[in-house]
Amino acid sequence: MFAPEVISREDRDGGYIETLLPAERGEVYYRSCVGGICRYSSDWFQAEIYLNQMLQP
């Protein structure tokens, strides 16, 4: 199994959202991460929601 290619990254307030391109054919998806915990989504706006939720104290 091959790792996805990170095609962009946006850092914000101690977390980030990466835009990922699958190694094999498929659609772009997003990874929201804070402190080593990540959530995945197929929608940029959902990735923003995940990041905001994980950044809240």
State where each predicted segment sits.
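Short N-terminal "domain-start" leader segments
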Residues: 1-29
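A short, charged, amphipathic alpha-helix used as a generic interaction element across diverse proteins
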Residues: 29-57
